UniProtKB/Swiss-Prot annotation:
PROSITE patterns: AA_TRNA_LIGASE_II
Family annotation (HAMAP family): Phe_tRNA_synth_alpha1 (MF_00281)
Source species taxonomy: Bacteria, Pseudomonadati, Pseudomonadota, Gammaproteobacteria, Enterobacterales
SUPFAM superfamilies tied to this protein: Class II aaRS and biotin synthetases (SSF55681), tRNA-binding arm (SSF46589)
The protein, known as: Phenylalanine--tRNA ligase alpha subunit
Record's GO cellular component terms: cytoplasm
Main localisation: cytoplasm
Note on how the cofactor is bound: Binds 2 magnesium ions per tetramer.
Family: Belongs to the class-II aminoacyl-tRNA synthetase family. Phe-tRNA synthetase alpha subunit type 1 subfamily.
Annotated source species: Salmonella choleraesuis (strain SC-B67)
Gene this protein is translated from: pheS
Biological processes annotated in GO: phenylalanyl-tRNA aminoacylation
Known partners and oligomeric status: Tetramer of two alpha and two beta subunits.
Length: 327
């Protein structure tokens, strides 16, 4: 007990001399640890008469508290000094130019889809969607393509079983729409479709958009006028356009639509036709009262023609050098 004041003074001196937190912790252990000087002072209480022990214990505890407060204060000083030193070493030169955040951009196929949806939206078309895993009825039968029809062989279909498949066209959306609502109908149906083919101009998955109008007094003239306006708007040119007779099981008459390319050659861009009466009957619409036209086009093909892309596979390879050109 006689050395208590001296111990506190020595502890204070050691605390002030500690140059970092590690050295300060050594001082704490020396004086307040399990075998520290002040801790050992508590053991001397057993040598005192019982009536003196409470007062003596209070004095020792006060000394320990004094040392602990000094330790806390010094630790705060050392940590603050260390932080200031680190901040000084990490000073940021605010005069340097900042790092520019590079803006992203839409994929070229997405840009094409958005552009087409915007055009037809102004004509009163609404966007309709449907399942990508389709059944045999909606993908083929309802579209006037029964099981024995040779057109099925042209689709290179991915089958799950005898009746389930990955849709080969978005025409199933038209069937579902016509079964769900009565005319007038005016929709476009964008979406992914699947065919078992892969080369420079074909991929197993690609994007298609189909359009459909069903109403009274719809004629081939309406179809031609709509597609003329669309193609000239899409390519932003007064294009030379021709309609070639063709065959699709779900339209009659049917046509392929070509545009004149910059090289003086005709380029096929889409297929179209008047909705076949059998298709209307299959969905419960009377072909004696209503008529309609439909058209379908590949989004990748239109994107290739619009931007001069020569390899369809470029759209799916995620090459930033390619994609950045469309920002």
């Amino acid at each position: 007990m006689s050395h208590l004041a001296e111990l506190v003074a020595n502890a204070a001196a050691a605390i002030n001399q500690a140059s970092d937190v590690a050295a300060l912790d050594n001082v704490r252990v020396e004086y307040l640890g399990k075998k520290g000087h002040l801790t050992l002072q508590m053991m001397t209480l057993r040598d005192l008469p019982p009536e003196e022990r409470p007062a003596a214990g209070a004095v020792i505890n006060a000394a320990k508290e004094q040392v602990q407060q000094a330790l806390n204060a010094r630790k705060a000083e050392l940590e603050s000094a260390a932080l200031n030193a680190r901040l000084a070493a990490e000073t940021i030169d605010i005069s340097l130019p900042g790092r520019r955040i590079e803006n992203g951009g839409l994929h070229p196929v997405t840009r094409t889809i958005d552009r087409i949806e915007s055009f037809f939206g102004e004509l009163g078309f609404t966007v309709a969607t449907g399942p990508e895993i389709e059944d045999d009825y909606h993908n083929f039968d309802a579209l006037n393509i029964p099981g024995h029809h040779p057109a099925r062989a042209d689709h290179d279909t991915f089958w799950f079983d005898a009746t389930r498949l990955l849709r080969t066209q978005t025409s199933g959306v038209q069937i579902r729409t016509m079964k769900a609502q009565q005319p007038p109908i005016r929709i476009i149906a964008p979406g992914r479709v699947y065919r078992n083919d892969y080369d420079q101009t074909h991929t197993p998955m690609f994007h298609q958009m189909e359009g459909l109008i069903v109403d009274t007094n719809i004629s081939f003239t309406n179809l031609k006028g709509t597609l003329h306006d669309f193609l000239r708007n899409f390519f932003e040119e007064d294009l030379q356009i021709r309609f070639r007779p063709s065959y699709f099981p779900f339209t009659e008459p049917s046509a392929e639509v070509d545009v004149m390319g910059k090289n003086g050659k005709w380029l096929e861009v889409l297929g179209c036709g008047m909705v076949h009466p059998n298709v209307l009957r299959n969905v419960g619409i009377d072909p004696e009262i209503y008529s309609g036209f439909a058209f379908g086009m590949g989004m990748e093909r239109l994107t290739m023609l619009r931007y001069g892309v020569t390899d369809l596979r470029s759209f799916f390879e995620n090459d930033l050098r390619f994609l950045k050109q469309f920002k």
